[in-house]
């Protein structure tokens, strides 16, 4: 399990029941997905048994209508920000100890003409060595 998987599980539990994946699917496969993409681990400090750092996870909300993309992105960011993280803290080789979210913003229109809104979730993590 990864930080992206933890965030996707949280969103599913918050009733955002769209398609989650690491790449944006074709409009034929899923017309209005929420895509969760994980960035690389960035180490802040290293201790004898563990290292601490951060992982940025980008949440992309894809919708046919601009207003829908915006409202779902705002609701998803709010759900992530207000969530009790304890049930979702275990992310496989690392543990999420805190999160910070950025405000959702319009990103682009994809090749199918759908509107994409995005927000970043910075996960502060501890991972064992």
Model segments located where?
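Oligomerization/assembly interface segments of phage tail-like spikes and tubes
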Residues: 51-69, 74, 115-125
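Acidic-leaning, charged glycine-interspersed low-complexity segments
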Residues: 81-128
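Short, solvent-exposed beta-strand/turn "edge" segments of beta-rich domains on protein surfaces
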Residues: 46-52, 109-112
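Residue-level signal for secondary-structure boundary sites
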Residues: 45, 67, 127-129
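Bilobed periplasmic-binding protein/Venus flytrap-like ligand-binding cleft at the lobe interface
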Residues: 75-80
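Small/polar-rich, solvent-exposed N-terminal microdomains that initiate assembly or binding
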Residues: 1-49, 71, 83-94
